[in-house]
């Protein structure tokens, strides 16, 4: 089985990866971080047993990083691992572990997904997410601006519709899916406002390396992968990147 999150073009040498699997030194869900390519994420874990790998994006260690921020990033990564791995230990399917881990990162303002997402040129958070399982079933959303956890909307597309990708789904569709919502202001942080102002004043306009993701293998050998992102700082409204496109940033087979 193969699962992958993010292509080479979205991973940089400062990307933060963390993995949890039975061969770790302590009880299964210890965190290890390294600067490795996405190929390594495909190979993490043992030939048998449960595995969880998460990816936080190099933006979490960008130019605004401080020792305190890096410490918070590492704490949130551990929380994400714990959330997903505990589900795998309890016998939950791989996709539930992926969603749980991504939830934690979407809720943490340090990452470019959910709360803390990069802002468009209009100053709003416009988010994308994708979830795929090893049986080929996939769901994705792009351009959501009020879904608290975009990965939930991607899961809803996968499980509740006959389609693969929804662009800017309506409020009625989101309500039918039963996913939690927030006003767009909820997603906007002061750091993201500053990043947008810098970009619009001639700074680093294309602040990249922000997609988060997770890959899991459950006790039955099933695999799943998911990604979530706020895109690129100062992107035009309506831009669609690779993150919600199956086979581009997310793949499980």
Report residues per predicted region:
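Short, Lys/Arg-enriched N-terminal segments with co-localized hydrophobic residues
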Residues: 1, 5-11, 16-30
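Alpha/propeptide regions of enzymes that mature by internal proteolysis
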Residues: 32-253
